[in-house]
Amino acid sequence: MESRLLDILVCPVCKGRLEFQRAQAELVCNADRLAFPVRDGVPIMLEAEARSLDAEAPAQPS
């Protein structure tokens, strides 16, 4: 994921910062505990497509 794109993208729910998790191919919002998938290099920034991280440990920066 391009760092320039990461500088622009924000969580669609809270407008907070996102972290790219390379191993899971996801953009993670730690504030909302949501992980947005990245498919074929395209971030899917829809709340309905996000995976909840509530039951998991906090995401670690990659």
UniProtKB/Swiss-Prot annotation:
It comes from the Bacteria. Gene3D superfamilies: 2.20.25.10. Pfam families: Trm112p. Disulfide bonds: none annotated. One of its GO terms (cellular component) is cytosol. HAMAP family: UPF0434. PANTHER family: PROTEIN PREY, MITOCHONDRIAL, ZGC:162634. Belongs to the UPF0434 family. This is UPF0434 protein BB2007. It comes from Bordetella bronchiseptica (strain ATCC BAA-588 / NCTC 13252 / RB50) (Alcaligenes bronchisepticus).
